[in-house]
Amino acid sequence: MKDQRARSRRQLQLEQRKSAEARAADRLEMLEAKLSEMEENLTEVATIIEYLVKSVFILRWKDVASEIRSLCIEQLGNWVQINPARFLEASYIKYLGWALYDQEHEVRLVCVHAAAKMYKLPNIEEHAEDFTTRFLPHMLKLALDKDIDVATEAVLMLVDVAKQQPDVISDEDKEQLFLLCFSQHRRVGQAAGLFLHQWLKSRQPASGPQSARSKRGKPRPLDSSLLKDIITFAEESSLRGREAFLVDSLACCDSMQAWETFVDLLIEQPGPGEESLALEEEEEVVAVALLVASVRQTVEKQPPQGRGGQKRVLTVKDQEERKQAREAATVCLLPALPHLLQKFLHLPETVALLLDLLQWLNLEMYTVGRQGKALDELLLMVNEVMKQPEHPALFDALSRALERLCVPGLSIQARCETARGHMLDRLATRYREGLDDVSSRPSNTMEHWTRRV
């Protein structure tokens, strides 16, 4: 009705601007009568709504039946959307705040939905500042609600709150919301990931590092600063082993699939003025874990283990996206993998993660893409890894990597089997030499060494 009134008012104004000769008197009268009728109808509707508020809503929003409470709050949310000029007042929206405390999760969910839609209205900060100040502490508690639907929608609502009023949520409360990225509940985690991504984006330079270059003069990717902040956050969170959860939570962030940027930050030395992009060793370890988790999830199209229940049945579109992701990861990581292995050779667990990347790459690219040199470098590094002190996770990863490289039918199978044979020969020689070395020692030493082997 408001749209129709505005349209009729414009038509009347256009008619009134015409000259007396061009103006149609009967049309002018018709438009005036139509506009007057609409004004009366709107006044009548407003009167009816006012009656409903005073005679029904105020009496029933705390009804003993949760269905009636939900209906009342839902309608209040609709009124706020339809007529914000009238209902965006403290005397009305306070009921939304009070309903956030309802004991029934269905009512809380309806209320959070209504409040979230309210925060999407333009210029809401002018009307809802007092509401936010008063009810924000409980909104933050709802992010930890026992009902997953309520918790998810509460975090999404807080995303809109932070967008409208960036400074209203304290740093301490933001940190608590950030940690929800590691939640076992996927929807809560991804809602928190949206909150984290929005906050990180707001801290990025407006222009971006367009002129930034590494020590050897290579231009930096535009999302280097954002990805560095994500890596730093993951390292400071001290939740090792849950990097896959963070990757899954930040599904909204394209930088998590920017594998070229990961490699750039890990391999390239910072240039002049790039001190903020330098990674500490602990951050490099986390960056590798994030990279591997990102490649795995993007290629497999499945949620991480422990967060998603049963595996998804992939559609034709999913299969095509998997293929494209595998090709993109292969092009980026095949040339870089030997350099990364060399860099982290002293860290067995990190090397094990890097070797597992072979499970999700298209190894035919070594032949099709004429990457023979990269294959030689990889086999050389695998041989170097085998010389390292024994480490269970590392040797498991080595066996998986060699098995993957020697899959029957691969164009590189013969080449890799030859290299594997040489490695096993050297390993057998190493075993025999060690056995001879301890054979002359006391029996208890011999038994201990044999058990280790």
Give short role names for the model-derived ranges:
Residues K2-R10, E15, I169-L290, S294-D318:
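Eukaryote-biased recognition of long, low-complexity, charge-rich segments
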Residues A115, F395-L398:
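Short secondary-structure transition/capping segments
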Residues V286, A397-E403, V453:
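Low-complexity, intrinsically disordered short segments enriched for Gly/Pro and polybasic residues
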Residues T132, S170-L180, S214-G217, L398, ...:
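Short, highly charged low-complexity linear segments
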Residues I68, E283-V286, L394:
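Residue-level detector of well-ordered alpha-helical segments, enriched
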Residues E384-K387, R400, R404:
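Eukaryote-specific, intrinsically disordered low-complexity regulatory segments in nuclear proteins
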Residues K2-V161, Q165-P166, L290-A293, T298, ...:
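Alpha-solenoid helical repeat scaffolds
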